[in-house]
Amino acid sequence: MRWLLTSSALLVPAAALVRPDGVGRTPALGWNSWNAYSCDIDADKIVTAANEVVNLGLKDLGYEYINIDDCWSVKSGRNTTTKRIIPDPDKFPNGISGVADQVHALGLKLGIYSSAGLTTCAGYPASLGYEEIDAQSFAEWGIDYLKYDNCGVPTNLTDQYTYCVPDSTDGSNYPNGTCVNLTDAAPQGYDWATSTTAKRYQRMRDALLSVNRTILYSLCDWGQADVNAWGNATGNSWRMSGDITATWSRIAEIANENSFLMNYANFWGYPDPDMLEVGNGNLTLPENRAHFALWAMMKAPLIIGTPLDSIDTSHLTILSNKPLLTFHQDAVIGRPAYPYKWGYNPDWTFDPEHPAEYWSGPTSSGEVFVLMLNSEGEVKTRSAVWEEVPELKDRGTKKNSKEKKGFKVTDAWTGKDLGCVKDKYEVKLQAHDVAVLVVGGQC
């Protein structure tokens, strides 16, 4: 089965899950507890993160969701009478609603986590079969965002067929994005929106729509069951791969996979390459920078996953980049940046180690963002040639003219005015680093 999209792919005319007040129209911005603390969470850590989002200026930049991930409930089971999930009284002595009150008082929103199975990934009670009860609980507690995972699925509710997700988390090899050893592929024309996986997620969607509160719905089915085909009608974002880790190899692999899904991203629905690892692990500063820039240009949800009360200034600077956040949240243009040249590889090569290196995307202000990545492990030169950038090649000087095409260019990282750049912009990049250019008017 071939998963790889082609260069001729057009925008997908999928039905979108449109919510009131613009909720989910642009990609989510926020913070989540998992990459920072895993299961070691409590009310104090969540409220501290919320306060830091305000104190560090992140709220002013648009970050708004403070999301509680797995391990927030009593692990032994539900209330035997009401069947409701019980918040852990040791971790959350005032319940989830108590945390919601504090988060809302800061002008922020609160998110929570469950799974479309019997248990969560950490073994806590999940929502399969209790969708309406849990949606009502979430609404009553003041929840604004639900991350819905794919763990704890009973064997009688697994899919009849297997969809090809070319991701290393299952240990297989995927030559150029294909699943050569897939033995139970769906027949041609099969509608994955009717699959058991899709129905599990649709049940929670319907439950959330039935309550008197707008809750952003973030699907986390790891790309299974061709979620790209039905995710936009079901949720506001959908995971397209297995979990991220704080390693460059994994970040590059996910960026490569997601680069072939950009035609699915637009207002109200976004493929999700997982939460940010900026500030975590042993990532170099260039790798942190490249990670954030790629996610922002792909218009992925930008969900911070590091302890904010101890964040390094250099990492905060990356997360606070105004030009990239402005591109990411453009209220007029919903499409993300697209790769226009692979650089290290021939175009349209599926390579987990070397994702597409040249990206561009338009803005409502008329500027064009151009990203150049050095996917190699040593210093390399990269060049943005204006005639190769789709949004620029038809502007200005005619192709047959001897005069070189020039544009006003600004460095998105430093804010430095690079002046009138003729023909191309060339830069030396450290291993796994990026340059992001804001290309303005002709000069």
UniProtKB/Swiss-Prot annotation:
GO CC annotations on file: extracellular region
GO biological processes: carbohydrate metabolic process
Gene3D superfamilies (UniProt xref): Aldolase class I (3.20.20.70), Golgi alpha-mannosidase II (2.60.40.1180)
Molecular-function annotations in GO: alpha-galactosidase activity
PROSITE patterns, alphabetized: ALPHA_GALACTOSIDASE
Annotated glycan sites: N79, N156, N176, N181, N212, N232, N282
Catalytic activity, EC: 3.2.1.22
Compartment(s): Secreted
Disulfide bond annotation, renumbered to this chain: C39-C71, C121-C151
Keywords: Disulfide bond, Glycoprotein, Glycosidase, Hydrolase, Secreted, Signal
Active site location: D149 (nucleophile), D243 (proton donor)
InterPro entries linked to this entry: Aldolase_TIM, Glyco_hydro_27, Glyco_hydro_27/36_CS, Glyco_hydro_b, Glycoside_hydrolase_SF, Melibiase_C
Catalytic activity: Hydrolysis of terminal, non-reducing alpha-D-galactose residues in alpha-D-galactosides, including galactose oligosaccharides, galactomannans and galactolipids
Range of residues in the leader sequence: 1-20
Binding locations of substrate: D221, W222, G223, Q224, A225
UniProt cross-references to Pfam families, sorted A to Z: Melibiase_2, Melibiase_C
Main location, first listed in the record: secreted
PANTHER family in the record: ALPHA-GALACTOSIDASE B-RELATED (PTHR11452:SF61), ALPHA-GALACTOSIDASE/ALPHA-N-ACETYLGALACTOSAMINIDASE (PTHR11452)
Assigned protein family: Belongs to the glycosyl hydrolase 27 family.
Main function: Hydrolyzes a variety of simple alpha-D-galactoside as well as more complex molecules such as oligosaccharides and polysaccharides.
Protein name: Probable alpha-galactosidase B
